[in-house]
A protein has these predicted regions:
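Conserved donor-binding/catalytic core segment of Leloir-type glycosyltransferases
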Residues: 113, 150-180
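Conserved acidic donor-binding segment of nucleotide-sugar-dependent glycosyltransferases
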Residues: 199, 252-264
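Short hydrophobic beta-strand element within catalytic cores of glycosyltransferases
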Residues: 237-241, 247
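Active-site proximal beta-strand in glycosyltransferases
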Residues: 3-4, 61-64, 73-92, 113
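Aromatic "clamp/platform" in nucleotide-sugar-dependent glycosyltransferases that forms part
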Residues: 220
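Acidic anion/phosphate-binding donor-loop and adjacent secondary structure
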Residues: 92-94, 124-125, 133, 138-156
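A short, active-site helix/loop in glycosyltransferases that binds the activated sugar's phosphate group
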Residues: 91-95, 100-133
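Short alpha-helical segment that forms part of, or immediately flanks, the ligand-binding pocket
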Residues: 206, 229-233, 247-248
């Protein structure tokens, strides 16, 4: 089977550092190739070039991994589906400019691979996409890439591994002495003199994530965060907000969910 995967066209695939969507696309490509499929990654930032590359490859199936490209759906002459990684999909009040993309989904009504049941409901209720076009397909992770040890170097320390930005709101938790941060900084409120480990390369991530006790992710919006799957692959517990609990078995002792109303108490 020939499969085209359309990426954002913003960063290289595979990424060298941060880039969850790019990592997912690369892992998906590798998994499908191992299964014997032929995969072409289209990762350019020009709509006409995207269509041209898809047509040149003549795939059996096309998977769009970037919301901004949903407008191309009707111009793709092969079976196609979209996946949105927008962190605020379940928080309509946080859409802001995304409302234009949501309206495009509502008008086109494409096939969608939803990252969770909650996101599927958003497409059904808010965008009036028929259930027959919606499929729940959570993110996966390449477990074989991660080092996993029984005795971590820093068992009493937790790591907040994510792009440091407004949605992740790392700056709110810098008073916690046992919480360390890794990621590129895109939020001027974050003090890089406090427990900042820099931006990790993929190689460093795969080797060293296992040496922390827990992963912390306290965003005010998430879809299905890949970093939680990476934490499990490396043997960590996770601490998330209610926005980051999609597809998690919250009855497990190594999963802690903090309600949004208690974020200020941390």
């Amino acid at each position: 089977m020939k499969i085209s995967i359309i990426g954002p066209g913003i960063m290289p695939i595979p990424p060298t550092g941060w880039g969850a969507v790019e990592t997912l696309i690369w892992d998906m490509r590798n998994a499908l190739t191992t299964l014997g499929h032929e995969v072409d990654i289209v990762n350019v930032n020009y709509p006409r070039k995207i269509i041209q590359k898809v047509n040149e490859f003549r795939p059996d199936f096309v998977h769009i991994h970037y919301d901004d490209w949903v407008g191309l759906y009707n111009y793709i002459q092969y079976p196609c589906a979209c996946t949105s990684h927008f962190g605020y999909l379940e928080r309509e009040e946080m859409f802001n400019g995304y409302v234009n993309i949501a309206n495009a989904f509502a008008q086109i009504k494409p096939r969608v691979f939803c990252l969770s049941e909650g996101i599927k409901k958003v497409y059904q209720v808010l965008m009036d996409i028929p259930e027959s076009n919606l499929y729940v397909s959570p993110n996966g992770v390449d477990c074989g890439s991660f080092n996993c040890v029984d005795t971590p170097d820093y068992p009493n320390a937790s790591i907040y591994l994510a792009k440091i930005d407004y949605r992740k709101r790392q700056h709110l938790f810098q008073s916690i002495p046992s919480l360390w941060y890794a990621g590129n900084i895109a939020d001027e409120r974050f003090d890089k003199t406090k427990n900042y480990l820099g931006e990790w390369s993929k190689k460093h991530l795969y080797k060293n994530l296992t040496h922390y006790g827990n992963l912390v992710l306290l965003s005010d919006g998430e879809a299905h965060p890949l970093v939680c799957m990476e934490a499990f692959a490396a043997g960590l517990g996770v601490v998330v907000t209610e926005w980051g609990k999609a597809n998690l078995d919250t009855n497990k002792k190594f999963i802690t969910v903090i309600p949004e109303k208690h974020i200020g108490d941390i």
